[in-house]
């Protein structure tokens, strides 16, 4: 393996790219094995591992691509450049964290930060990552290179001015962009477009340019109404910037996983590209996280190498192709290597790789795109026109993903059902069969069918208090709840309400929620045991209403073309005792059948079995509930006649304090 600066690549002035105009493109690459010294202190496995950049470099070499690029040596960032976006205290902390004087404190410091590990190689790697992006950006802005890819780690887009978080120590892209704008005015870079296609919102980058009209920040990410990392409202489409920077911050927040090429390209074609054309940047930075790639263990999305190559190719229309890619996330080694190769081939202006069969965006994707356009159109006239009905009705229904317990027979049945559902043909009102879920108008036929079936919805959390539950049925908001619920399509109240006790463990976890703010929310272990007892309030509602409650609980829209939980799924959990995971990786994605009451299935929704293990290990935090949330549970237990106030408080305290 050749190292950065060795003879594997061309030197400045040499080139072997395709012809662009009257000359050939010079594509820069930076890679340094030294950045692999940043690792977990105890050698434990971690998704942000050194092999992430090794496999990319090896892939580029094996494909003969790195040999056709200009390979630059890495460079350490200067403190004065880091302090363009970071506080002096933060820079000093990262600088000193790998010294022997900090050996005994390093783990304690990391434990106080959000999703950070530190070791003796962390400081040098962080300085090299930021400095290398600065160096590459300077070469591109000077015209010595046309574009380039900095294969660096640790990543940067989560790092804020005074805080390391989300695997990020310095905000590499923000440092480099600020360097060009503030330290090299002679280069004539006055407007910078930063595109962040990492599956997680670039919260750090957004905050650093929040009031700066020189930087247009565009982030497309899983958001799920603030439930996906980094949790909160920062990634919402209403966050558009402030003061002179108002309108220069654009978020495209997916409300579910499974988004793929069609969804991302729709966001490009109907938001990013028209705005970029108006903005007319001088340089483009790309926070190139590949964790939205297919098979990524953290992202849950389905972007292919072809999808990344097309997105990048569309951006090369602007800034005379002056694009600087900086690696962010991406945790499937095969996906990150293939996606990186596809992007470098585009930079060299090679022919794009063959793409997958044509597909349509999810119907939820069009809703997000329309909401973003409506919010931003006052700043960007190109977004003012409404999208055509014909366009937005080229869509795919929200996906349904089935999982099961470890029982192989049940797992086969679940997969078989998924296969059958994927082959369904849907008849539209005109009688035309639409294959592969390419439906036209939103169908309501499933609602009529599911409205005929009753189920018991068993609540163990805030929905035990009936006024709170009715928000999911009739819409509205109760005291302490920070969001307004849209309600169900059928707003009929529950036909009956009863209380039961079930042998499942109640616990509270997660850092915060959109509905209740900072503090844990209630979950039950999907598996029963002989020790624990959980009080649940059972509401008799229709299966149609249950779908709408399930959708709202998991941040999905209720006006879906297809049910999240249909009659086949009900039969599956009823007969086989399976667990159905509907919205992938959602907090309450598991539907569990607890038995029957008067021959009517009792259904509850909770976390997955794998999530329980993550709660136990500490990967997902156990947290006591917020006061308003706990009070809602207590009111439900008391007003429902289940417990006295003192008993209810003791019940909640026990669930909080008892180890999982």
Curated annotation (Swiss-Prot):
Its main location: nucleus. It is found in: Nucleus; Cytoplasm. The active site is at 158 (proton donor/acceptor). Residues 26-349 are annotated as: Histone deacetylase. It catalyses: N(6)-acetyl-L-lysyl-[histone] + H2O = L-lysyl-[histone] + acetate. Changing residue 200 to A: Loss of enzymatic activity. Expressed in stems, leaves, flowers, siliques and mature seeds. GO terms for cellular component: cytoplasm; histone deacetylase complex; nucleus. Keywords: Acetylation, Chromatin regulator, Cytoplasm, Flowering, Hydrolase, Metal-binding, Nucleus, Repressor, Transcription, Transcription regulation, Zinc. The record marks 331 as: Polarizes the scissile carbonyl of the substrate. The modification N-acetylalanine is found at residue 2. Binds 1 zinc ion per subunit. Disruption phenotype: Delayed flowering under both long-day (LD) and short-day (SD) conditions. GO terms for biological process: flower development; negative regulation of gene expression, epigenetic; regulation of timing of transition from vegetative to reproductive phase. Interacts with HDA6. This is Histone deacetylase 5. It comes from Arabidopsis thaliana (Mouse-ear cress).
């Amino acid at each position: 393996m050749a190292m950065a600066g060795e003879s594997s690549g061309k030197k400045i002035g040499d080139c072997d790219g395709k012809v662009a105009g009257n000359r050939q493109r010079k594509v820069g690459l930076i890679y340094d094995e030294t950045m692999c010294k940043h690792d977990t202190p105890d050698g434990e496995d971690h998704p942000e591992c050194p092999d992430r950049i090794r496999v990319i470099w090896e892939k580029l070499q094996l494909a003969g691509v790195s040999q056709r690029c200009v390979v630059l040596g890495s460079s350490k960032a200067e403190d004065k450049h880091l302090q363009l976006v970071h506080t002096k205290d933060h820079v000093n902390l990262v600088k000193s964290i790998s010294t022997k004087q900090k050996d005994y404190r390093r783990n304690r410091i990391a434990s106080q930060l959000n999703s950070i590990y530190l070791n003796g190689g962390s400081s040098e790697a962080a300085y090299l990552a930021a400095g290398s992006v600065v160096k590459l950006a300077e070469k591109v802005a000077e015209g010595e290179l046309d574009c380039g890819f900095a294969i660096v780690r640790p990543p940067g887009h989560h790092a804020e001015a005074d805080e390391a978080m989300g695997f990020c120590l310095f905000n590499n892209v923000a440092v480099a962009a600020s360097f060009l704008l503030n330290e090299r005015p002679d280069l004539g870079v006055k407007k910078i477009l930063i595109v962040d296609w990492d599956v997680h919102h670039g919260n750090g980058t957004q905050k650093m340019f929040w009031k700066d009209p020189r930087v247009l920040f565009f982030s497309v990410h899983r958001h799920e109404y603030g439930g996906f990392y980094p949790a909160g409202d920062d990634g919402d489409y209403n966050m558009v910037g402030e003061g002179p920077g108002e309108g220069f911050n654009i978020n495209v927040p997916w409300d579910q996983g499974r988004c793929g090429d069609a969804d991302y390209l729709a966001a490009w074609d109907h938001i990013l590209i028209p705005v970029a054309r108006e903005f007319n940047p001088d340089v483009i930075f790309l926070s190139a996280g590949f964790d939205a790639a297919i098979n990524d263990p953290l992202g849950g999305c389905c972007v292919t190498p072809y999808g990344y190559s097309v997105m990048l190719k569309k951006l090369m229309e602007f800034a005379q192709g002056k694009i600087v890619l900086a690696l962010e996330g991406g945790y499937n080694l095969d996906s990150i290597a293939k996606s990186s190769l596809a992007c470098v081939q585009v930079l060299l202006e090679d022919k794009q790789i063959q793409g997958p069969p044509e597909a349509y965006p999810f119907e939820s994707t069009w809703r997000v795109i329309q909401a973003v356009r409506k919010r931003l159109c006052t700043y960007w006239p190109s977004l003012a026109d409404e999208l055509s009905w014909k366009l937005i009705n080229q869509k795919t229904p929200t996906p349904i993903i089935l999982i099961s317990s470890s029982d192989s027979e049940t797992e086969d049945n679940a997969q078989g059902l998924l296969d059958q559902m994927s082959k369904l043909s849907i008849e539209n009102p005109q009688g035309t069969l639409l294959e592969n879920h390419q439906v036209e108008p939103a169908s309501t036929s499933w609602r009529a069918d599911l409205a005929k079936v009753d189920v018991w919805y068993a609540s163990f959390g805030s929905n035990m208090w009936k006024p709170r539950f009715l928000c999911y049925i009739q819409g509205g908001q109760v005291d302490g709840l920070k969001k307004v619920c849209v309600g169900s399509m059928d707003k009929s109240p529950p036909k009956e309400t009863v209380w039961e006790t079930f042998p499942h463990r109640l616990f509270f976890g997660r850092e915060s929620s959109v509905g209740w703010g900072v503090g844990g929310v209630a979950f039950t272990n999907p598996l029963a045991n002989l020790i624990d007892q959980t009080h649940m309030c059972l509401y008799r509602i229709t299966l149609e209403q249950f779908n709408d409650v399930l959708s709202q609980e998991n941040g999905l829209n209720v006006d879906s073309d297809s049910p999240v939980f249909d009659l086949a799924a009900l039969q599956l959990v009823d007969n086989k005792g399976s667990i159905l995971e509907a919205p992938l990786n959602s907090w309450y994605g598991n539907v569990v059948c607890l038995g029957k009451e008067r021959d009517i299935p009792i259904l509850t929704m909770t976390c997955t079995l794998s999530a329980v293990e993550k709660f136990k290990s500490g990967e997902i935090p156990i947290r006591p509930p917020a006061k308003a949330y706990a009070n809602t549970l207590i009111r439900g237990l008391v007003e429902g006649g289940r417990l006295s106030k003192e008993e209810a408080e003791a019940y909640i305290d026990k669930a909080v304090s008892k180890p999982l």
